[in-house]
């Protein structure tokens, strides 16, 4: 990629992604450029007419190649949004689906409708911890347990819990086995 303004670079990356059938190529291009240059959205927008620094172009080219090869954008950027919060994700965990946010909403609604003051919630196969952490943050009186068979996934979940300031009890194990011995689990 030759020397270009930020705006021209966005257009060039958009065209490249579009040529390979990447859905929403313009958004992908802007996000990949921000990732490569470590810019905020505000910085990117306020510098559209400036020349893009060339020192990070190889990084950008690598990121674009990964996206063209269909690597999920969230794995490339290392983050995803879930329930209005940013969670770290990588290949050790599945990317939380937007539909899973409904599970959080329904769990909260269920607890409120039942009038459970101090609910105990279990998230089996927690992955990134997005569901467990979101429930814990939305219901501070809840005691939340999260399990996963993968120690690597639990590292990601624990990192997210620490970053978002919540206490979820994480344990490694297969399905509900690690929750045996706990008294009543409400959800």
Question: Residues of each region from the PLM?
Answer:
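N-terminal auxiliary segments of SAM/dcSAM-dependent transferases
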Residues: 2-77
């Amino acid at each position: 990629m030759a020397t270009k303004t930020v705006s021209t670079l966005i257009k060039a990356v958009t065209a490249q992604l579009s040529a390979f059938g990447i859905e929403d190529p313009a958004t992908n291009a802007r996000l990949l450029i921000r990732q490569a240059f470590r810019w905020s959205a505000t910085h990117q927008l306020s510098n559209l007419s400036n020349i893009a620094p060339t020192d990070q172009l190889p990084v950008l080219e690598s990121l674009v190649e990964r996206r063209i090869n269909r690597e999920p954008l969230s794995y490339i950027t290392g983050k995803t949004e879930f329930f209005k919060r940013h969670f770290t994700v990588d290949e050790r965990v599945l990317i939380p689906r937007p539909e899973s946010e409904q599970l959080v909403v329904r769990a909260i609604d269920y607890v409120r409708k039942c009038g459970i003051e101090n609910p105990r919630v279990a998230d089996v196969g927690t992955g990134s911890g997005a569901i467990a952490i979101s429930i814990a943050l939305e219901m501070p009186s809840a005691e939340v347990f999260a399990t996963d068979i993968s120690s690597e996934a639990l590292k990601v979940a624990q990192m997210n819990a620490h970053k978002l300031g919540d206490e979820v009890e994480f344990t490694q194990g297969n399905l509900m086995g690690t929750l045996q011995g706990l008294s009543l689990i409400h959800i």
